[in-house]
Amino acid sequence: MTHTPVLLKEMLSLLSPQDGGIYVDATFGAGGYSKAILESADCKVYAIDRDETVTKFYDDLSVRYPDRIKLFIEKFSNIKSILSSVEPSPVIPVLDTGKNNWSRAGMTSNGVDGVVFDIGVSSMQLDNGDRGFSFLHDGPLDMSMDNSSYINASTFVNALREEEIANTIYNYGGERHSRKIARAIINARKKKTIKTTFELADIVRSVVFRGKSKIDPATRTFQAIRIWVNDELEELEKGIKAASEILSENGKLIVVTFHSLEDRIVKTFFKDLCATDCKTFSLLNKKVIEASIEEVSANPRSRSAKLRAIQRLS
């Protein structure tokens, strides 16, 4: 499956890239957002992704836009240290202990002009059976986005206690059958180690029946395990907070989410930030932006997408 950037037009309209601007694509993936930003203005993009397999997409863009894009294989929560390591750095730490202790090198304004996030698993990760993200492809139980973590989906199903499994599936997946699923996993692993995505999906389906639902019974369990493996919610909290602290005056922070837990984190953070610091930050869209009927028809993945954005005023 080709990865199609979700809410691309809406993101670009809000970001409004300018010549000479500095932007951060915090979730590079297949490079859809980065490419669109680079095409829109004579600007620079610093791209971040924890998955080293994205380098093939970066290589294409770096040839097309030499000296205008640079990729960092890192967690986006490290955005401050990443940008401070660049020569010349768009943001550098300074000694004052004020609210904003990051400044743009050689310029009067502070920080970067925009940061964009497209949260969650990508199509290329889902479609690669060896990564273990999807029950549609048989593969090892991995699900780690950096493809090298010692904690993976196998750790979750084969090492955690029953209560931990049940609570995680319920809290991160919203699965009301979480206790039955946890018990089934424990019973299965007593007989043999659970090794593949198909094995796990079959275990879930053995106790949760599809009925008339269009959603596979294993969907919520796989989602919950993926979130747990990659510590996605805490990473999101750290990432958007750090991003908000390096915005320039009039800089924009745009976040696209695909899960209610993610959206709640972003909504709450933006609302609180703008309420407590209304002279510094403002909501760009008071009502969440969702994909159009046309986009959902062309790209079903966009059905659950929600876009929220803020702007730094001073």
Swiss-Prot record:
Superkingdom of the organism of origin: Bacteria
Predominant place of localization: cytoplasm
Disulfide bridges in this chain: none
InterPro entries recorded: RsmH, SAM-dep_MeTrfase_MraW_recog, SAM-dependent_MTases_sf
GO BP annotations listed: rRNA base methylation
This enzyme's EC code(s): 2.1.1.199
Record flagged with keyword Mitochondrion: no
Annotated GO CC locations: cytoplasm
Binding site for S-adenosyl-L-methionine: G31, G32, Y33, D49, F76, D118, Q125
Localization of this protein: Cytoplasm
Catalytic activity: cytidine(1402) in 16S rRNA + S-adenosyl-L-methionine = N(4)-methylcytidine(1402) in 16S rRNA + S-adenosyl-L-homocysteine + H(+)
GO molecular function, one term: rRNA (cytosine-N4-)-methyltransferase activity
Keywords: Cytoplasm, Methyltransferase, rRNA processing, S-adenosyl-L-methionine, Transferase
Physiological role: Specifically methylates the N4 position of cytidine in position 1402 (C1402) of 16S rRNA.
HAMAP family registered for this protein in UniProt: 16SrRNA_methyltr_H (MF_01007)
Family the UniProt entry places it in: Belongs to the methyltransferase superfamily. RsmH family.
Entry protein name: Ribosomal RNA small subunit methyltransferase H
Naturally occurring in which organism (per UniProt): Wolbachia pipientis wMel
